[in-house]
Amino acid sequence: MYLQSSLALVLLRAAVVHGYANPGACSGACNIHDPSLIQNGDGTYYRFSTGNNISFASASSIEGPWTALGSVLPGGSSIDNSGRYDPWAPDVQKVGDLYYLYYAVSSFGTQESAIGLATSETMEEGTWTDKGSIVTSTTGDQYNAIDANLLVDGSANYLTFGSFWQDIFQVTLNGDATSSTSTPVNVAFDPATTHPVEGAYLYKYGDYYYLFYSWGTCCGYDTSRPAEGEEYKIKVCRSSTPTGNFVDASGVACTDGGGTVVLESHDNVYGPGGQGVYTDPNLGPVLYYHYVDTTIGYADSQKLFGWNAIDFSSGWPSV
């Protein structure tokens, strides 16, 4: 009894030290990069991800078992870009009666990029219509037009995007969320080092808009491991408006390096990122992401689907 109590106390203290719950269960097709999560009208979960011209899978539960279904754009993107046959970083949202999937085409590490849009009534394979590009960037721009996320807020549509350079920007979209109606505005910037901010996701909860983003080195951990603490992690800032003035929990502006850590490497979890937030009908707000399980391997192809319920009781998200 004493040994069991001591072990429980040790485990509790360990949990307090790192402060993060382990990822929720996943079975079936769990290898993934840059996930996007949604449910259809009958409650089936759909999960989209980078690779195979936007892979997608379905499951009856967020835990799985996940079944791979195919590709959203099996012939690649219609956008005239060198990355058209390798679209990445999907973001799926329901807009009216349609499912919208925003995606990126680019060459890694360049600004010759575009954010594209595909739509479907059902999300089934073969039903997606590619609408082409809605935001583009080129060498010399302040931003890189990849990693898009749509927030539908009443009658307004906000597209947040960006990666490195001047980091995260936002545009307002038209009523059917198919084209930009504004000039991109900077909403997050880390002035230090290489400005490693990307993968923004804007989520409204209560009276605040929470800007989640990935910070650090994302990929290639099997061949070149970054210095400790420089690997991917998930940060957040918040604002009372969706269009700017985001600050972290210490009051530091998100445009001046602010950002409160939500999830970082812990235990067997390494480099969590590529995140989104989904309002699950049973679990409430859920943070989902990809991560490396250090007991399995560090290659990009070995990254796994992770998720945790979010606690907003303090006014700031914690997992």
From Swiss-Prot:
Keywords from the UniProt entry: Carbohydrate metabolism, Glycoprotein, Glycosidase, Hydrolase, Polysaccharide degradation, Secreted, Signal, Xylan degradation
GO MF term set: arabinan endo-1,5-alpha-L-arabinosidase activity
CDD domains in the cross-refs: GH43_AnAbnA-like (cd18831)
Record's signal peptide: 1-19
Known EC number: 3.2.1.99
Class in the EC hierarchy, top level: hydrolase
Lineage: Eukaryota, Fungi, Dikarya, Ascomycota, Pezizomycotina
Gene3D superfamilies on file: Glycosyl hydrolase domain, family 43
Organism of provenance: Aspergillus oryzae (strain ATCC 42149 / RIB 40)
Superkingdom of this protein's organism: Eukaryota
Pathway this chain belongs to: Glycan metabolism; L-arabinan degradation
Catalytic activity reported: Endohydrolysis of (1->5)-alpha-arabinofuranosidic linkages in (1->5)-arabinans
This protein's name: Probable arabinan endo-1,5-alpha-L-arabinosidase A
Compartments it resides in: Secreted
Glycosylation sites: N53
Gene that encodes the chain: abnA
Record-annotated membrane-spanning stretches: none
Coiled-coil regions listed: none
GO biological process terms, semicolon-separated: arabinan catabolic process; xylan catabolic process
Protein family membership: Belongs to the glycosyl hydrolase 43 family.
